[in-house]
UniProtKB/Swiss-Prot annotation:
Keywords: Isomerase. This is Ribose-5-phosphate isomerase A. Pathway: Carbohydrate degradation; pentose phosphate pathway; D-ribose 5-phosphate from D-ribulose 5-phosphate (non-oxidative stage): step 1/1. GO terms for molecular function: ribose-5-phosphate isomerase activity. It comes from the Bacteria. The gene is rpiA. Homodimer. It is an enzyme of class 5 (isomerase). The lineage of its organism: Bacteria, Pseudomonadati, Pseudomonadota, Betaproteobacteria, Nitrosomonadales. Signal peptide: none annotated. Its EC number is 5.3.1.6. The active site is at E102 (proton acceptor). One of its GO terms (biological process) is D-ribose metabolic process. It comes from Thiobacillus denitrificans (strain ATCC 25259 / T1).
Length: 218
């Protein structure tokens, strides 16, 4: 299977986890395949909560109801991709810039199902640059603090998040303890959040491989 075929396969497999209630939906190319597959069974769910404006637009284009997170309770499941994921279910996310809303929706969900092709499975996080969402006026301060943590932050030029903030992509971080690093970066004044999903990692990984979809659970 090609990488895109793997993404389509895991997206279809993830639909089995959307049995009813309100579903949280992630952002990115793999999540887009999930939205397309979800459209075929939209009658069995009550609605969705989107993690970005782009996701909301795609859901609505399929006639799938998009709800405000503040108007609903706990979500049944959150389905999203990852830029990297380990066998311990810690992830780097945010390549598409939606990390803050993704992290919020994930925190409000009973179950997190990660869908990815096998190129995203890694032994140690950090080859993919870690996105950090930052209040614009704090950009330089946060960058200096990230250098102290061993990283090389670079501004994502010409990009503004749905929340009106900027993204620093941090290269060359040694992410041996993702839970501790997630906490440390979030404590820097001016950081909204970072793309480490370790404190709230995935519960299920649907991994697309050349031989089909493999399922891993905590």
């Amino acid at each position: 299977m090609t990488q895109d075929e793997m993404k389509r396969a895991v997206a279809r497999a993830a639909v089995d986890y959307a049995k009813g209630g309100i579903i949280g939906v992630g952002t990115g190319s793999t999540a887009n395949h999930f939205i397309d597959a979800l459209a075929e069974v939209k009658g069995r769910i009550e609605g969705t909560v989107a993690s970005s404006e782009a996701t909301a637009a795609r859901l609505k284009s399929h006639g799938i109801q998009v709800l405000d997170l503040n108007s609903v309770g706990e979500l049944e499941v959150y389905v999203d991709g990852a830029d990297e994921i380990t066998q311990h279910f810690a992830m780097i996310k945010g390549g598409g810039g939606a990390l803050t809303r993704e992290k919020i929706v994930a925190a409000c969900s009973k179950q997190f199902v990660c869908i990815a092709d096998d190129s995203k499975l890694v032994d140690v996080l950090g080859k993919f640059p870690l996105p950090v969402e930052v209040i614009p006026m704090a950009r330089s301060h946060v960058a200096r603090e990230l250098v102290k943590l061993g990283g090389q932050p670079r501004l994502r030029e010409g990009f503004t998040t749905d929340n009106g903030n900027v993204i620093l992509d941090v290269h060359n971080l040694s992410i041996i303890d993702p839970v501790s690093l997630e906490t440390a970066i979030n404590q820097i004044v001016g950081v909204v959040t970072n793309g480490l999903f370790a404190r709230r990692g995935a519960d299920v990984l649907l991994l697309g491989t050349s031989t089909g979809v493999k399922t891993f659970t905590r």
